[in-house]
Amino acid sequence: MTDEDELVAAVKADEGEKVRAIHERNPFLLRMPTPEGTLVLTAVYHGSNNALKALLDRTPEDALNLYEASATGNPRRLKTILGQSRARVNDPNPEGFTPLGLAAFFGRPEAVRVLLDHGADVNQKPPSRFANTALDAAVAGDHLEVVRILAEAGGDVNVRSERNYTSLHKAAAHGNADMVRLLLDHGADPNATRDGGNTPLDDAREKGHAAIVDLLKTRGANE
């Protein structure tokens, strides 16, 4: 196995010590490209927190790109990047994810605020396979604070993603009462139907979330 392959495997397996060892013998590999874009993004996507720490400890902050800074939640680096005229805050990466979508999905509230302050489109639907906005991505990631920030910034709580799911469908299926309440408070439709005909109440019931079913009923959901 080459050092390149071994390093990618170590990142995916969250083997921080192995990442450090490979870096010692070949430090230039840390900025090698990967299918996800960079090793930092590979670590974030796979939830490899130990590997991510090893990578960030060995990566100069000014080497992080827009997508890495968004996904890892580095507001200081974001401010520097976005202060440069060449930065394009709404441009998706090769996988179709925007900086705001990455910060939202991975629960980086400070990064979300910086991106919004620099003109990120809160309702942009990038060409990713999930076809979701940043708010919907934050709901999928179960990040209540980020959803609140985006909703207060004008995020559409009734936008549709793949198979016509709304954010309320996802929150109801997750069983997150606070998220359901927040979405309803911002105008989410409790009777929206997705492909297959299910409403959020139907999805909550199928997942066994009785408290969510009761909550939705009190907020206008039909049986």
Q: Residue locations for each model-derived region?
A:
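N-terminal segments that cap or nucleate solenoid repeat domains
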Residues: 2-32, 73-92
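Conserved ankyrin/ankyrin-like repeat signature
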Residues: 18, 50-51, 77, 110-111, ...
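Alpha-helical adaptor scaffolds
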Residues: 125, 132-141, 145-148, 152, ...
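Ankyrin-repeat and related helical/solenoid repeat scaffolds used for protein-protein interactions
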Residues: 158-206
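Ankyrin-repeat boundary/"N-cap" motif
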Residues: 2-7, 32-40, 62-68, 92-98, ...
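Ankyrin repeat domain, specifically the short helix-to-loop turn at the C-terminus of the second helix
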Residues: 23-28, 54-60, 82-88, 113-121, ...
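Ankyrin repeat A-helix N-terminal signature
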Residues: 9-14, 42-48, 68-74, 102-108, ...
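Ankyrin-repeat-protein effector appendages
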Residues: 1-9, 53-68, 153, 186, ...
